[in-house]
């Protein structure tokens, strides 16, 4: 079973950019209600896709330096990375089915 990694400005490069496979990053904040709705969906995805992707969450208030690099303007923002490349982006709360479709379209 895969758990969600807590990402920080300090560990982002090691955990995401240097990772050899796909990493789904959720940019979020504690005050964001759509982020709270998305949280349990991400937990399920982390378990169901444990052999395909790594899932991480980056709190943009506690870690203010990383989000501007990727032009994060709205949250929740989901970015799918492969190495240093952003393959796809999805902004806003989405259903589990929409998230699975997003991943299946981009993980090949």
Curated annotation (Swiss-Prot):
One of its GO terms (molecular function) is protein-disulfide reductase activity. Residues 2-108 form the Thioredoxin domain. Coiled coil: none annotated. Keywords: Disulfide bond, Electron transport, Redox-active center, Transport. GO terms for cellular component: cytosol. Pfam families: Thioredoxin. Transmembrane segments: none annotated. GO terms for biological process: cell redox homeostasis. Disulfide bonds join 32-35. PANTHER family: GEO12009P1 (PTHR45663:SF11). Participates in various redox reactions through the reversible oxidation of its active center dithiol to a disulfide and catalyzes dithiol-disulfide exchange reactions. NCBIfam families: PRK09381.1, thioredoxin. Belongs to the thioredoxin family. This is Thioredoxin. It comes from Buchnera aphidicola subsp. Schizaphis graminum (strain Sg). The gene is trxA.
